[in-house]
């Protein structure tokens, strides 16, 4: 054990699973906010790898201010068209000029790298989007603030662990409640295995879960793709198929009563339905920004403590807004996996600018235990796990750079 400031205490509330009302949301991959998150993070990973390959380590950068301005479209059964393209602006800071100690200079085309990474992400994630006509991607990356670059830069030999770039915090929790798990898995299924054999379902899928006592109510907003929907009957059939699929998935995770609603704003008589040309509402009136959607664990959970930091696009080496949100979630999951008798657990990590990121100002763990288990029975084991996770924080950075960790 080290002398890290790790606190373990009882959480002064019941487990979220016992709340009378629980609300959980997930914005799917094609939601405008998630598009921005995904582009920002893919650009982040690409820049980090490029720096590592060119100069041997990651330089100062952030791409967490990416914005999306919605376009205009005219969807129609059998196939419509985009009238005005979506506009995406990748915004941030990135080191484009680096001089090594021996005087070797590196000029890094950061905007070109970012542009190609953004287009690559769109190509892989939104297959119904024509990159030549349906979207404009722009990049504006300035140089970083000098004082933050100094915090980022290693000393002569380089510290074993980077210094925190900010005084900030991250929050994580575990285990997921039944409602949280269902909401997460429903979107992932609709944008994964289900979409593979049902091209009519677009990537813009939002899932809102509400649990009142033992009744889980799910509302799905699913953009359907007009080229694969020939008429209203086909549209209605697709909506019903989605409802049945999500219902079956939900009942695999719970014995509670489940109700599923899909595209509740539809008016079949007037023809007002959720039909798109590209599979995303970004084609028509729905703007997006990094950090307005899912938190680091992929969910929006108002029953839980949450950080308002945008995790996607932040530098994975020393940006606390990214590292501590991912690490606190990882710590919570590790504790629940290894320690018996825990019903609910919350982790809060607070940094102090200039201090090593493996030495938080405080690592606070709050626990709800099962009947028959006291916090005193498990606090030493929890502290050991937290200490080990903090000690290996640089491995988390590597996993993020290599695309092994999701941020939204």
Curated annotation (Swiss-Prot):
Keywords: ATP-binding, Magnesium, Nucleotide-binding, One-carbon metabolism, Transferase. Catalyzes the formation of S-adenosylmethionine from methionine and ATP. GO terms for molecular function: ATP binding; magnesium ion binding; methionine adenosyltransferase activity. ATP binds at residues 142-147. One of its GO terms (biological process) is one-carbon metabolic process. It is an enzyme of class 2 (transferase). Pfam families: AdoMet_Synthase (PF01941). Its EC number is 2.5.1.6. The gene is mat. This is S-adenosylmethionine synthase. Belongs to the AdoMet synthase 2 family. It comes from the Archaea. InterPro entries: AdoMet_synthase_2_family, AdoMet_synthase_3, S-AdoMet_synthetase_arc. It catalyses: L-methionine + ATP + H2O = S-adenosyl-L-methionine + phosphate + diphosphate. Its cofactor is Mg(2+). Pathway: Amino-acid biosynthesis; S-adenosyl-L-methionine biosynthesis; S-adenosyl-L-methionine from L-methionine: step 1/1.
């Amino acid at each position: 054990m080290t002398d890290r400031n790790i606190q373990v205490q009882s959480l002064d509330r019941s487990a979220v699973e016992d709340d009378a009302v629980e609300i959980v949301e997930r914005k799917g991959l094609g939601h405008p906010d998630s598009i921005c998150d995904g582009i920002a993070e893919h650009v982040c990973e690409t820049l980090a790898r490029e720096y590592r390959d060119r100069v041997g380590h990651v330089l100062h950068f952030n791409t967490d201010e990416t914005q999306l301005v919605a376009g205009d479209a005219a969807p129609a059964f059998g196939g419509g068209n985009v009238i005005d393209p979506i506009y995406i602006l990748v915004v941030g800071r990135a080191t484009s000029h680096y001089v090594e100690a021996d005087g070797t200079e590196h000029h890094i085309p950061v905007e070109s790298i970012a542009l190609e990474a953004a287009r690559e992400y769109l190509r892989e994630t939104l297959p119904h989007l024509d990159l030549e006509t349906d979207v404009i991607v722009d990049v504006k990356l300035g140089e970083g603030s000098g004082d933050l670059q100094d915090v980022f830069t290693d000393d002569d030999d380089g510290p074993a662990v980077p210094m925190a770039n900010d005084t900030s915090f991250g929050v994580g929790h575990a285990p997921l409640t039944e409602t949280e798990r269902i909401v997460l898995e429903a979107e992932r299924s609709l944008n994964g295995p289900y979409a593979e054999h049902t091209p009519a379902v677009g990537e813009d899928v939002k899932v809102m879960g509400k649990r009142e006592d033992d009744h889980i109510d799910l509302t799905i907003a699913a953009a359907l793709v007009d080229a694969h929907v020939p008429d209203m009957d086909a549209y209605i059939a697709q909506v019903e198929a989605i409802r049945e699929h999500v219902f079956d998935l939900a009942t695999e995770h719970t014995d509670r009563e489940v109700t599923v609603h899909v595209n509740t704003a539809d008016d079949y008589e007037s023809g007002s339905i959720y039909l798109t040309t590209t599979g995303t509402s970004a084609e028509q009136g729905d703007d997006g920004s990094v950090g307005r959607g899912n938190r680091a664990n992929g969910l929006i959970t108002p029953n839980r403590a949450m950080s308002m930091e945008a995790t996607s696009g932040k530098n994975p080496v020393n940006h606390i807004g990214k590292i501590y949100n991912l690490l606190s979630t990882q710590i919570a999951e590790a504790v629940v996996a290894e320690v018996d008798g825990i019903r609910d657990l919350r982790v809060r990590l607070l940094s102090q600018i200039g201090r090593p990121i493996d030495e938080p100002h405080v690592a606070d763990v709050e626990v709800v235990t099962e009947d028959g288990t006291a916090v005193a029975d498990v606090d030493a084991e929890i502290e050991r796990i937290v200490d080990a996770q903090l000690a290996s924080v640089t491995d988390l950075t590597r996993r993020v750079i290599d695309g092994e960790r999701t941020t939204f």
